[in-house]
Amino acid sequence: MRRPIVLIGTEGQVLCERCEIADGFISRGRGLLGRTTLARGHGLLIRPTWSVHTAFMRFAIDVVFLDAELTVLKLARNLRPWRAASRLRAHSALELAAGECDRLGIGVGDRLAWASLDPAR
């Protein structure tokens, strides 16, 4: 996985203060498997993908499907273990702790942006 990034919402608010990026074959396949929880403010951006599953996971998640410009296409709230969600034409999926979409006010059509956690970049 690459260095974590910060995801910023349409209104400039921090949506995910520590977002890991899974963009390799192994990291995309592994996703959040093996973790017992996902802390508030943390997330996993999987790219490229248009579908996710929660097989073998131990907790529910919110999934935000994004296009290539980071515009929200679909929300899958409180996706429990052993479920799947997809959105055709999505470029990536942001996995957050269950309830984060509602808490942060994320909605379809919102445009996200990212910033590096590395001050040298």
Q: Where do the protein language model's features map onto the residues?
A:
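Compact, glycine-rich, soluble single-domain proteins
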Residues: 1-121
